[in-house]
A protein has these predicted regions:
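Local sequence-structure signature of Cys/Sec-based thiol-disulfide redox active-site neighborhoods
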Residues: 31-63
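Loop/turn elements at helix/coil->beta-strand transitions in domains of secreted/extracellular proteins
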Residues: 35-36, 66-70, 91-93
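Solvent-exposed, acidic/flexible segments
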Residues: 34, 46-50, 54, 78, ...
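Non-catalytic, surface beta->alpha helical segment in thiol-disulfide oxidoreductase systems
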Residues: 97-135
């Protein structure tokens, strides 16, 4: 009986690892004119709201635009983040959606709604990103 349970748990863990690898590949490989890149810039010290902005925005953007969107959380305290922060002109915590040379800053909405009204945040993300795709 113990062997059967151990075998079942092992198979479950293997399935989790392989499933995540495939999902990660899909999330990082959109291409074409409708490609959307979402960035959440943050620092090492993060409050509950900061974490909620990242998790809610990531879930919504990748869920609303599967195969067309990427989401990257970038720590501004890491020296390796300087080139992308400079390119996008970011100096502080920011939730940014980019398509080509067009940008939408969703920082205010993210911090306003991530914990208090996540459905409103999803609606705002959809409205603004859909508008970006039409351009």
């Amino acid at each position: 009986m113990k062997r059967a349970i151990l075998l079942s748990i092992s198979i479950l863990f293997l399935g989790c690892f392989f499933g995540k690898a495939q999902t990660a590949q899909k999330e990082t490989s959109p291409s074409g004119p409708d490609k959307i890149e979402a960035y959440y810039f943050h620092f090492n010290a993060r409050c509950e709201t900061c974490r909620a902005v990242e998790s809610e925005a990531k879930a919504y953007i990748l869920g609303l635009y599967p195969g067309r969107a990427t989401f990257k959380a970038i720590n501004l305290d890491d020296a390796s983040s300087k080139p992308i922060a400079d390119k996008l002109k970011i100096s502080g915590q920011t939730l940014l959606v980019v398509r080509g040379d067009k940008q939408i800053n969703l920082t205010n909405e993210g911090f306003m709604y991530a914990t208090s009204n996540p459905d409103k945040l999803k609606a705002v993300i959809k409205q603004k990103v859909d508008g970006l795709l039409v351009r």
